[in-house]
Amino acid sequence: MKIIYPEELKQKLIKKLNYFYILLGEDSILLSKAEQLIFYFAKDKKFIEKNTINIEKSTDWNKVINFHKSKNLFFKKTILIINFTIKKLNLSLVKNINKIPLFKNKDILTVIKLNALSSLIKKSTILKILILESEIIYCSTPYEWAFKKWLQYEIKTRNLKITQESFLLLHKYYEGNTLCLNQILDILSITWPNENIKIEKIKKIINQFSIFSPVNWINAIFNKNKKKAIYILDSFFKQKYNPLILIRTLQKDLLILLNMKREKKLNINFFLKKNNISLNRSKFFANALYYIDFNNFLKIIRILLQIEIKIKKEYNNSVWIQLKTLTLLLSSPMKYTP
């Protein structure tokens, strides 16, 4: 399976526009950017019309068949977007999907969004016929080297002049948060379009426009990145974010972590998939499983309960002090020895 990464897509489209594209992953920013690029180059080839078919159940595939049957003399060049919201594939649907290349037509450009099915496709050959005929674009949230390459590409695309120190700061605080970083880069390009952007300017923008999710906070904790975890928590405090959402999200992930610890033979990816956790987070759970002192779990659960009671009875800023204590406790590198 040959994968096209987001930073490679534009050059691929310049060379050749294919008739089949598979968008593999669930990152909303990467999906949106990939679609926009495909649409832009398709428009140049006179693909003006768009038709979206959502596959929510296996019988919805009939809509795809009917679309192809409806082609007539007055048919205009169309981009067909097949959007899978279904969570599982049955044999009948697999057979039908693999037949898509048989419908190959110079007037139809097909974009397949696999969404939640992406992890299944990466590890299986069930759609091998479709994969052989398609360009596969990787749209999962990038981390580490992949995030670095994507960030470099986005900076270059906007013609931003950013110092190495500034680049490293953006990478440090926004790794895995494409939504927030995309917005920050847009702000930088509007604010300082032709200037050399030094770290002081980056810090100023970061302090003014910080958009994080509870998952970003938990990932930083599980990755032993105390400084980043506290920074994200402070951002939530400034935004007057509902701390109960943070508590519930953390409780859920800690429970999953505890159940992972109890497994005698653990397949992390399978376990996370079963619990509806993105496989992109597997490294964070693996890290936490390795270093968190599970003897502290009772203490952690006790603090969580205290915070929840305080939120419901007499909410005040001391809740955030307790959340900070909890963050430091969880992100301390205490290797667990079984």
UniProtKB/Swiss-Prot annotation:
GO terms for cellular component: DNA polymerase III complex. Pfam families: DNA_pol3_delt_C, DNA_pol3_delta. It catalyses: DNA(n) + a 2'-deoxyribonucleoside 5'-triphosphate = DNA(n+1) + diphosphate. Signal peptide: none annotated. One of its GO terms (molecular function) is DNA binding. Disulfide bonds: none annotated. DNA polymerase III contains a core (composed of alpha, epsilon and theta chains) that associates with a tau subunit. This core dimerizes to form the POLIII' complex. PolIII' associates with the gamma complex (composed of gamma, delta, delta', psi and chi chains) and with the beta chain to form the complete DNA polymerase III complex. This is DNA polymerase III subunit delta. InterPro entries: DNA_pol3_clamp-load_cplx_C (IPR008921), DNA_pol3_delt_C (IPR032780), DNA_pol3_delta_N (IPR010372), DNA_polIII_delta (IPR005790), P-loop_NTPase (IPR027417). It comes from the Bacteria. DNA polymerase III is a complex, multichain enzyme responsible for most of the replicative synthesis in bacteria. This DNA polymerase also exhibits 3' to 5' exonuclease activity. The delta subunit seems to interact with the gamma subunit to transfer the beta subunit on the DNA. The keyword Transferase applies. GO terms for biological process: DNA-templated DNA replication. It comes from Buchnera aphidicola subsp. Schizaphis graminum (strain Sg). Its EC number is 2.7.7.7. Keywords: DNA replication, DNA-directed DNA polymerase, Nucleotidyltransferase, Transferase. Belongs to the DNA polymerase HolA subunit family. PANTHER family: DNA POLYMERASE III SUBUNIT DELTA (PTHR34388:SF1). The keyword Nucleotidyltransferase applies.
